[in-house]
Amino acid sequence: MEIIHETILEVDVNRLKSNFIYLKSKLKEKTKIIAVMKAYAYGHGDIILAKKLEEFGVHALWVADFEEGSRLREGGVQIPIIIANPGTKSTKKIIDNKLDVVIYNFKLLQLYGELNKEICVHIKFNTGMNRYGFNADEAKIIAKTLLKYPKLKLQSICSHLAA
């Protein structure tokens, strides 16, 4: 009979806090930390970990889609939650849960702008991964478009850096 061993990973919240404090100590005082919590924290208790990170002083959380963001918000997380792939069909849920969105093309920029609702946005540029993101030469057009939609609140410029 073959013995099957389970793989178990436990997150030590005290060490998580210690690591956060250490990393924060290496940054300039006003630097904000955004914790990536994609895939429901890979099964490690997304709501529990998100609340702990919020307690430690993380500025915002980054998740893959609106379902993850909505779950965290409904679980009581108050800090900004950034949706990496907001899509086009989840706008109501995103607005209702006050979720931030990453805008990586003109279709999304126009869609969220035309909703005429206050939405915090993060503009993503392609810096070599060639997956999602505006090209650098589109920056002026993006800026002009954002001015056209004053209810879109620019929070950051971001990218997924290529190794």
Predicted feature residues:
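Glycine-rich phosphate/diphosphate-binding loops that line cofactor/substrate pockets in enzymes
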Residues: 20-31
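Active-site-proximal beta-alpha core segment in soluble small-molecule metabolic enzymes
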Residues: 3, 8-10, 15, 31-163
